[in-house]
């Protein structure tokens, strides 16, 4: 049974300061109330889906903050939990993200590669920048997008200020991340590094089918795909 948080007394947990949810997020996250022999239990929808090994990566509801350290910590914790729970069963990472911090995104990426289960990635809406990189980093053969999803790759964004030596240090760090991301994208897509470097010089948008041809994903998911044996 699915209810609004205003329809059930247990939904007051979403208003708890301990959850640290933005006000807009707490107002629209649905509650799932389950009946069992031991009574009622209420879950926010994301916790309930986590029981089915589904993780969502996106900006907070009502904002487009994207991937930051707090988001990365949450995703990493969920991946580690599911790895400990069942190391053989696939994990599904749904991505609708404008991107964000490179270092935070790499924390998620390294964890995806570290854990034992296959990580199936699926883009719905938008996977841009680091979101597209994580989409491509799913288990080969299990990287997907919905038909109207958009995928965008580009080089890391950054800026520096201060003394000349500080600017030089930051510039070297940006170039390191650019080179590393391009190498990994080349590895995941099968594209030559020269093409990756050229395509990521500016925002490079693709449809789901174009992303499949490029090698960022393996299949475009349709209703027929889901119904096929």
Curated annotation (Swiss-Prot):
The UniProt entry's GO biological process terms, in alphabetical order, are: protein quality control for misfolded or incompletely synthesized proteins
Q: Which residues form the signal peptide?
A: none
Where it sits in the cell: the answer is: Cytoplasm
Instruction: Indicate yes or no for the key word Protease.
Output: yes
Q: Which Pfam families match?
A: CLP_protease
Q: Which CDD domains match?
A: S14_ClpP_2 (cd07017)
Swiss-Prot/TrEMBL catalytic activity: Hydrolysis of proteins to small peptides in the presence of ATP and magnesium. alpha-casein is the usual test substrate. In the absence of ATP, only oligopeptides shorter than five residues are hydrolyzed (such as succinyl-Leu-Tyr-|-NHMec, and Leu-Tyr-Leu-|-Tyr-Trp, in which cleavage of the -Tyr-|-Leu- and -Tyr-|-Trp bonds also occurs)
Q: What is its main location?
A: cytoplasm
What UniProt keywords apply to this chain's record, in alphabetical order?
Answer: Cytoplasm, Hydrolase, Protease, Serine protease
Q: Which InterPro entries does the UniProt record give?
A: ClpP (IPR001907), ClpP/crotonase-like_dom_sf (IPR029045), ClpP/TepA (IPR023562), ClpP_His_AS (IPR033135), ClpP_Ser_AS (IPR018215)
EC number(s) stated in the UniProt entry for this protein = 3.4.21.92
Cite the active-site annotation. 129, 154
Q: Which GO terms describe its cellular component?
A: cytoplasm; endopeptidase Clp complex
Q: What's an example of a GO molecular-function annotation for this chain?
A: serine-type endopeptidase activity
What is the similarity comment for this entry? Belongs to the peptidase S14 family.
- Oligomeric form and interacting partners: Fourteen ClpP subunits assemble into 2 heptameric rings which stack back to back to give a disk-like structure with a central cavity, resembling the structure of eukaryotic proteasomes.
Q: What does this protein do?
A: Cleaves peptides in various proteins in a process that requires ATP hydrolysis. Has a chymotrypsin-like activity. Plays a major role in the degradation of misfolded proteins.
Which NCBIfam families does its entry note? clpP (TIGR00493), PRK00277.1 (NF001368), PRK12553.1 (NF009205)
The name of this protein is ATP-dependent Clp protease proteolytic subunit 1
